[in-house]
Amino acid sequence: MSLHPDLEAFLDLAQDSQDAGLPAMHQLTPSEARATFEQTTAQLRWPAPQDLEVSEIETLTRDGAALALRLYRPNGIESPLPVLVYFHGGGFVVGSLDSHDGVCREFCQRTPCAVLSVGYRLAPEHRFPTALEDGEDALAWLAEQAASLGLDGSRVAFGGDSAGATLATVLAIQAVRWPHTVAIAPKVQLLCYPVTDASRVHDSRLLFGEGYLLENDTLEWFYQHYARGPEDYLDWRFSPLLAEDLRGVAPAIVLLAGFDPLLDEGQAYVDRLRGQGVEVEVEVCAGLTHDLLRLGAVVPGVLEVYSRVGGALARALEIG
């Protein structure tokens, strides 16, 4: 297995920048890291679909804070529309509706379905489990508003990438284990290179923890900002691989990257789900790294991944 040549050249440039003294994310303050992440997003932007209806929405969390949502709708598709509720990646510390705008546009167009992107609050200002509670509140809003917006509350997927995939799968588990906390039960979960186990270092973190976009030191920096204390690492809502009972959770579409420090824990989660009778469709993008969905400008073949994953989502949501 070898890196995609376009991605290898991109990683070489990133390494040159660090060698020249540009600080790594874990050497920044959270506010500096967020600004850098958004700047990088602008540099990585690709021509994602624009022929969509996009609405900015604001609702309130249970504690009265503003919760930003963004609703994407494909044109020319009859209502009621199935919905992908999407949680962006960024280690619970960085990322935003804007940083993953292109990701949501691709899934909206290529599935096609409505996409509700959730601007959950970030750590360390809002530590675990605030992001999950914001996710619960977003789902409560969707349950109340779906019919009036022409959305089908019976055909909903929970999805996300990296830390966002963690939120998506934990909410999918809660829908079965703690149904009183989740207003809508998903038909399927879309988990793109998820964080599933902060409690230990898996082998892929040793193999790919330096020089492959996501660094081990950055991972630990994320966890330390998100957790209230070390005991949170053992909470299944922080590390869903540690969940005792996964029986009955929604079928999963799982996307992994071959050069990702999170590869092994992602595969371990696939194995756990299958071992407890959950249907799982998995794709490993062999020559790619973590955050591959935002690399369409670097590796054009990433857009084909969206088509394959969108097709799987369409089947699961009974589209077409």
Tell me the role of every PLM-derived stretch.
Residues 169-320:
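Alpha/beta hydrolase fold serine-hydrolase catalytic domain that processes acyl esters and thioesters
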Residues 160, 164, 168:
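Gly/Ala-rich beta-loop-alpha elbow adjacent to hydrolase catalytic centers
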Residues 69-80, 241-246:
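Short beta-strand-to-loop junctions in surface cap/lid or active-site-entrance loops
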Residues 126-148, 309:
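Alpha/beta-hydrolase active-site loop
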Residues 1-71, 318-320:
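A glycine/proline-hinged amphipathic helix-loop "lid/cap" segment
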Residues 143-158, 178-179:
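Gly/Ser-rich "nucleophile elbow"/oxyanion-hole loop immediately N-terminal to the catalytic nucleophile
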Residues 80-89:
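Short beta-strand element of the alpha/beta-hydrolase
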